[in-house]
């Protein structure tokens, strides 16, 4: 692993076809194409988690740039407003870290947060929410902020869709997704047609924004433990990241058969949350 010009550069052992390039000219000799940028959080949910940018030029040219430490425990989501502000939900939630692996000893509340895209630092604000263990957060094309919460399979509100007031942090229930355990939603994404996608660790769903009802699309094939989902409108492609050690990976998602095509090794473990930076 080397750094060059402030960028993280690596030759990927698990995906030989993918190289994390440090040069803005790219790794190949082909003409440079426009960059599709994503933001994600790695080493999540630890307080020393980092915001990273992921620049995709093609399947052989992916650049991962560490931006900075989040500085707050439990920031597992990332969403981008139309105004260009990055949001997350931070705090222990209902996460019981019995082995003290992530520095969280007891469950606690979560709050909406903004993330500085230059430093990675998260600032929590607004009304705290209890026992929702929110992982999934995303803005709709009309600017509405959505989240899915309540990870308790025994709860009558398990896997419920919410709208979130981005000024106060207040949650308003839309309705239960109806997706059964273990399909708790880890991330959300919208395509250009306004379709809301939800990813559990094991499969892809669509979610009705008016009722909250989720419909299974397909199981993921060729990967699993998906916890990041992002849509790139320029390429009309759905991307995903997984939550694993020692290194997470970036994939392209085939929405017809669920196949996950590997794009790159992210270079960090435990990636959670993915959002596209639109031009």
Q: Which sequence ranges carry the predicted segments?
A:
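An edge-strand/N-cap motif at the start of beta-rich repeat modules
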Residues: 30-67
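Conserved beta-propeller blade signature
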Residues: 37-42, 85-88, 144-147, 195-198, ...
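Surface loop/turn motifs at the tips and blade-to-blade linkers of beta-strand repeat domains
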Residues: 65-71, 125-130, 174-181, 218-222, ...
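Blade-level signature of beta-propeller repeat domains, shared across WD40, Kelch, NHL, RCC1
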Residues: 249, 255-279
């Amino acid at each position: 692993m080397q750094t060059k010009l402030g960028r993280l550069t690596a030759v990927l052992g698990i995906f030989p076809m993918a190289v994390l390039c440090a040069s803005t000219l790219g790794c190949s000799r082909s003409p440079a194409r426009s960059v599709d940028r994503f933001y994600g959080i790695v080493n999540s949910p630890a307080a020393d988690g980092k915001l990273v940018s992921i620049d995709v030029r093609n399947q052989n040219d992916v650049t991962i740039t560490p931006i900075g430490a989040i500085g707050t425990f439990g920031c597992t989501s990332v969403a981008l407003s139309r105004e260009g502000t990055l949001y997350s939900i931070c705090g222990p939630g209902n996460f019981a870290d019995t082995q003290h692996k992530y520095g969280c000893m007891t469950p606690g509340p979560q709050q909406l947060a903004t993330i500085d895209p230059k430093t990675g630092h998260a600032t929590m604000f607004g009304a705290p929410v209890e026992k929702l263990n929110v992982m999934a957060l995303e803005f709709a094309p009309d600017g509405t902020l959505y989240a899915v919460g309540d990870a308790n399979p025994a709860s009558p509100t398990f896997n419920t869709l919410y709208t979130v007031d981005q000024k106060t942090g207040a949650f308003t229930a839309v309705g239960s997704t109806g997706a059964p355990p273990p399909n708790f939603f880890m991330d959300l994404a919208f395509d250009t047609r306004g379709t809301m996608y939800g990813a559990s660790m094991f499969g892809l769903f669509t979610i009705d924004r008016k009722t909250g009802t989720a419909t299974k699309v397909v199981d993921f094939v060729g990967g699993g433990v998906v916890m990041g989902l992002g849509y790139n409108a320029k390429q009309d492609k759905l991307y995903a990241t997984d939550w694993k050690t020692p290194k997470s990976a970036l994939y392209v998602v085939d929405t017809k058969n669920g196949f996950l095509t590997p794009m790159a090794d992210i270079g960090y473990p435990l990636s959670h949350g993915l959002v596209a930076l639109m031009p």
